[in-house]
Design a protein with these regions (language model features):
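Conserved histidines in hydrophobic membrane contexts and catalytic metal-binding motifs
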Residues: 1-381
Length: 381
């Protein structure tokens, strides 16, 4: 039996090994993207001095709106519970566009721009730097990443069978990484012991990652949890920022900035009631992580373990600011919840900093497994 699995392990690893290394390494580089960006651009994400009270949220939105061209609108404002963090004002375009504003002075600190390094790592991780074909042709990069990830699952499972020790002594020895007995021994120990230590996390990351590659897999994966897949965005699995940006089409149609033709037709500012909504949601949710308010809707997210994209959603009257409805995360549809859980488990954020560090290390070890495997295989030829 082990002989068969050894052949499966080898002949799946040889053609897909380098792809697995690229996928794992690029994934590891993305784990702490936010922390790296905030460390390198602290002046963008944090205010210089915390004032006695922030400006009204509507005032902040109007200050940004006054600087925008007629084709771009303010879609929402995200306020963190940390008073030293700058507010994020989301824009209608381009996709995911936003600027950071000092909520105490109204100073526009700068525009959010994803660093080229992380953009490259993301595209490498998801699509091997390929792009979706405008004519709807085969998305080869996405397909290759998905296929390599699926093969990685079989490689990991076959690796368990090959490794499985017969005695306790063999088990103890196989879980040691010795560094003083030559390069070959080190590579062997790293491949065997490293693979076993990270096995569960690598399997979890691979199995959740496949849901973004193949629709048939996503459908089956959801059904395992008794959930039917739904079309559309992240629902309650989406972050507050994503949810806010989801309202950009409605915001754009209604003229999400004062001035221009909309102002001439209707003197009502879409930002008038935002401060009232913000204050009420803060009072209702004292343990909030961030609150995002946009036209007629708002989301509240929390700093809790588990689904890091969990959020309560509210609707309100844009003129009066009266809360007209609420859909709490605990009452949300299961498909929205599982989307957020898949993301949180895949990136390791579900358990806070500890699980993120473990996922980062596991991904790095996963990137090394094909390389050490190639080395050991070539030495045997």
């Amino acid at each position: 039996m082990k002989k068969v699995f050894r052949k499966i392990h080898l002949w799946l690893s040889v053609p897909f090994g380098l792809l697995i290394t690229l996928i794992c390494f690029s994934g590891a580089m993305l784990v702490f993207e936010t922390e790296v960006m905030e460390l390198c651009h602290r002046d963008l994400y944090y205010v210089e001095k915390v004032g006695p009270a922030p400006l009204p949220m509507g005032k902040v939105a109007e200050k940004v709106a006054a600087t925008l061209p007629d084709s771009v609108f303010v879609t929402g404002v995200t306020a963190s519970s940390a008073p030293e963090r700058a507010w994020q004002v989301n824009l209608s375009k381009p996709r995911r566009a936003s600027v950071y504003v000092d909520q105490y002075t109204g100073e526009i600190k700068g525009k959010y721009e994803r660093a080229p390094f992380f953009t490259t790592m993301f595209r490498l991780h998801r699509w091997l730097l390929d792009s979706m074909k405008p004519d709807g042709g085969i998305f080869w990069g996405k397909m290759i990443v998905g296929t390599a990830t699926l093969m990685f699952v079989f490689v990991l499972i076959s690796g368990i069978v090959i490794w499985w020790p017969r005695t306790k002594k063999a088990l103890k020895n196989s879980l040691k990484i010795v560094s003083g007995k030559g390069w070959r021994r080190f590579c062997y120990d790293l491949h065997v012991a490293g693979g076993m230590y990270t096995l569960v996390l690598l399997l979890v990351m691979a199995l959740t990652g496949l849901s973004w590659s193949f629709s048939w897999y996503r459908t089956g994966f959801y059904k395992v949890f008794g959930v039917e897949t739904t079309q559309g965005g992240g629902g309650h699995g989406a972050s507050a920022q994503t949810a806010a940006q989801g309202g950009e089409r409605a915001q754009g149609r209604s003229g999400g900035r004062p001035g221009g033709e909309h102002r001439e037709r209707n003197s009502f500012s879409p930002f008038t009631s935002w401060q009232k909504v913000y204050e009420e949601l803060k009072e209702l949710n004292p343990d909030y992580k961030q609150i995002t308010v946009f036209k007629g809707s708002a989301t509240v997210s929390f700093n809790r373990l588990g689904n890091q994209r969990a959020a309560d959603r509210y609707t309100f009257n844009p003129r009066s600011g009266e809360i007209t409805g609420a859909t709490l995360y605990k009452d949300a549809d299961a498909s929205g919840k599982i989307r957020g859980w898949i993301f949180s488990v895949h990136v390791g954020s579900w358990g806070g900093l500890t699980t993120r560090i473990l996922s980062f290390l596991a991904a790095l070890v996963g990137a090394s497994l094909p390389l050490t495997g190639y080395y050991l295989w070539i030495r045997r030829l």
